[in-house]
Amino acid sequence: MQHYLIVWTFPTVEGSWESCPGFADYINAGGPGDSFEGFQLKYRVCEPIGGSGVAIAEATDIGKVWAHLGPWIKGYGIQFEVSAVVTDAEFASMWPGVAAVAEAE
């Protein structure tokens, strides 16, 4: 599973405000789209005044992340930036191999 950093922003404050009832309903329903085969939302925080937020997810591939974000893009026009990231432990385990390749160059 790959970790992904998801950063979102609403194009307008009005759009952010209009999404609040739907988002509250989604959270109150237990976040039904936050976990499915090949995808698990690990953490989400929102900055509701400015209409932005950040999440960390684990997914088998970027297509699973897109599937999770699709309804929010279509329904509310939210803009997302998605980056593959690693945990501290993953970084530490990868570093020796990366350093070895860098030294060989």
Where are the model-predicted features located?
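Conserved, structured core segments of small domains
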Residues: 1-105
